[in-house]
C-alpha cells in the first residue's frame, strides 16, 4: 500500500470539536473554559485521535490536545465513551458537553452543532485488500461495502449515491459500531471495501504492519 492509501472518495471536511446541540443550548452555553468541569464524548477506539493503550488508559492526539488546553484554565476534564451513532443526541441531552474525537466538520453536522475552528484536514477513503483486485470505484459494483454508523463517510455515501451507493451490493453498506470491527470483517473477506477516515486507516495499517496488503 502506498503512503496515500485508498481511493479518495470525497473531502469529508476539516476535523474540529463541537459543542451545544439544540438552539436553546446554543443560546445558554458559555465558554467551556468558564466551566469547572467538562465532559467530552468520544469513540474510544478511534486511533490515533482517542483510544485505549495496552494498559487500558485513554490516549491519542485529541486526548492530549484537550488536556493541554483545559490545563490552562484548571478545568477538570472527564472523557465519556459514547455510541458514535448517537453522538449528537448525547450532546442535545446534555450527557456530554462536547464532542472532541476526530469529528469532521460537514454542512449537515453544522445544522446540529456549533463547531470550533478546524485544526486538521481529513479525507474519506475506500480501502480494499490488494488480493481483491479492486482499485477503482466501478469495481465495487455488486460488492459488499462497510462503514461506521454515524460517520461522515456514511453520511456522504447516502448524500452522493452516484459515487458508490447505486452500485454496491444491496445499495447500502454494512454498518459497524467501530472501525476496529469493520477492519476485522475486511481482513476476513466478509466485506470487500471499507469507507474510512484517512487518519484512522494510515495509523491502523502502519501500526499493525499491514500497510502493503491494502489498496
What are these regions (language model features)?
Residues 38-42, 138-155:
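Short loop->beta-strand "edge-of-pocket" segments that line small-molecule binding or catalytic clefts
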Residues 66-74, 153-175, 205-210:
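Ligand-binding cleft/hinge of the Venus flytrap
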Residues 15-19:
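C-terminal motif of bacterial Sec signal peptides marking the signal peptidase cleavage site
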Residues 27-102, 175:
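Extracytoplasmic small-molecule ligand-binding "clamshell" domains
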Residues 72, 80-81, 85-98, 112, ...:
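Short helices/loops that flank or line small-molecule/ion binding pockets
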Residues 86, 103-111, 156-159, 185-188, ...:
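A ligand-binding cleft/hinge motif common to bilobed small-molecule-binding domains
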Residues 21-23:
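Bacterial signal peptide processing site
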Residues 67, 76-139:
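Acidic, polar ligand-binding/catalytic clefts
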Amino acid at each position: 500500500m502506498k503512503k496515500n492509501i485508498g481511493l479518495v472518495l470525497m473531502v469529508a471536511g476539516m476535523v474540529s470539536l463541537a459543542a451545544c446541540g439544540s438552539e436553546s443550548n446554543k443560546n445558554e452555553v458559555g465558554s467551556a473554559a468558564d466551566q469547572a468541569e467538562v465532559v467530552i464524548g468520544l469513540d474510544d477506539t478511534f486511533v490515533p485521535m482517542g483510544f485505549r493503550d495496552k494498559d487500558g488508559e485513554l490516549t491519542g492526539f485529541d486526548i492530549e490536545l484537550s488536556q493541554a488546553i483545559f490545563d490552562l484554565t484548571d478545568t477538570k476534564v472527564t472523557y465519556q465513551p459514547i455510541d458514535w451513532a448517537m453522538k449528537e443526541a448525547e450532546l442535545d441531552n446534555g450527557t456530554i458537553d462536547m464532542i472532541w474525537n476526530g469529528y469532521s466538520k460537514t454542512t449537515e453536522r453544522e445544522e446540529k452543532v456549533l463547531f470550533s475552528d478546524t485544526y486538521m484536514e481529513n479525507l474519506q477513503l475506500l480501502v480494499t485488500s490488494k488480493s481483491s483486485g479492486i482499485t477503482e470505484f466501478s469495481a465495487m459494483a455488486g460488492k459488499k461495502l462497510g462503514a461506521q454508523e454515524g460517520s461522515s463517510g456514511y453520511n456522504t455515501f447516502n448524500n452522493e449515491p452516484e459515487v458508490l451507493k447505486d452500485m454496491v451490493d444491496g445499495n447500502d453498506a454494512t454498518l459497524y459500531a467501530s472501525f476496529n470491527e469493520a477492519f476485522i470483517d475486511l481482513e476476513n473477506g466478509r466485506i470487500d471495501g471499507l469507507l474510512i477516515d484517512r487518519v484512522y486507516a494510515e495509523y491502523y495499517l502502519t501500526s499493525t504492519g499491514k500497510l502493503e496488503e491494502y489498496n
